[in-house]
């Protein structure tokens, strides 16, 4: 189930109604999710489900599903299974014969893409690049991609990532999106080289979305 990526008003009526009716909510971070649930007076039982406890939690959630009860899966922000372990839970639900139903809503991937000004006809979502092993190879595989490439990145690695993309892919149109849908939303458009110059003197906080275009002279920002 999708939840807001920043602005708490970006949740659907259907999502609120479903969260109130299910037997259990599996949340990536219960502390952050409780803020959303409190806003909409949702008192459903909630447990944590994240990368480091997913295998233990799968067993507990499986028991709930086998009792013919519904479980809602939510992430910190946006759509589950996009760069988080909800994929494993979806697979397990399918294996035990439960119906899997997506309740759509906010997604940082699509919000950043449509507001970036880069081509939207084809895109590749890379998520977070590996911190070390396989990182360079993963970028090299994108050299000939005829699509907009979308990355998630932590602020403390953003400069390094932009620099490495510039070194391997060459200079291309690129965009940084941060704080999407929030009060201080910021979208910085330019090229990999111009973004690198900005990052030499500016530090962002939190997670950012980084978009890189194919190398096409018609796409560059003026």
Mark where each language-model region is:
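Class I SAM-dependent methyltransferase SAM-binding "motif I" and its flanking Rossmann-like core
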Residues: 88-145
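Short active-site oxyanion
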Residues: 19-25, 98-100, 148-149
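A contiguous loop/helix-start segment that scaffolds small-molecule binding in enzyme catalytic cores
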Residues: 69-70, 148, 152-222
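Short glycine-rich anion-binding loops that position phosphate/pyrophosphate groups of nucleotides
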Residues: 5-6, 76-80, 155-157, 215-217
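Glycine-rich, flexible N-terminal cofactor/catalytic loop recognition
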Residues: 1-51
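Glycine/small-residue-rich loop that forms an oxyanion/phosphate-binding "nest" at active or ligand-binding sites
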Residues: 50, 58-107
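Conserved helicase motor
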Residues: 49-55, 128-130
């Amino acid at each position: 189930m999708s939840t807001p990526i920043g602005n708490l008003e970006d949740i659907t009526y259907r999502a609120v109604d479903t969260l109130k009716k299910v037997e259990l909510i599996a949340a990536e971070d219960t502390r952050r999710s409780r803020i959303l649930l409190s806003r909409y007076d949702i008192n459903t039982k909630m447990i944590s489900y994240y990368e480091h406890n997913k295998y233990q939690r799968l067993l507990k959630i499986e028991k709930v599903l086998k009792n013919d009860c519904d479980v809602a899966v939510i992430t910190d922000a946006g759509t589950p299974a996009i760069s988080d372990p909800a994929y494993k839970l979806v697979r397990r639900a399918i294996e035990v014969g439960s119906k899997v139903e997506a309740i759509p809503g906010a997604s940082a991937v699509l919000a950043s893409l449509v507001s970036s000004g880069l081509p939207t006809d084809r895109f590749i979502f890379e998520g977070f690049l590996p911190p070390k092993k396989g990182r360079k190879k993963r970028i090299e595989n994108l050299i000939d991609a005829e699509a907009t490439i979308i990355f998630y990145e932590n602020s403390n690695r953003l400069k390094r990532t932009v620099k490495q993309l510039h070194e391997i892919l060459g200079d291309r149109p690129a965009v940084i999106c941060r704080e999407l849908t929030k009060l201080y939303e910021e979208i910085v458009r330019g090229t990999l080289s111009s973004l690198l110059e900005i990052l030499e003197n500016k530090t962002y906080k939190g997670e950012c979305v980084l978009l890189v275009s194919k190398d096409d002279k018609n796409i560059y920002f003026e």
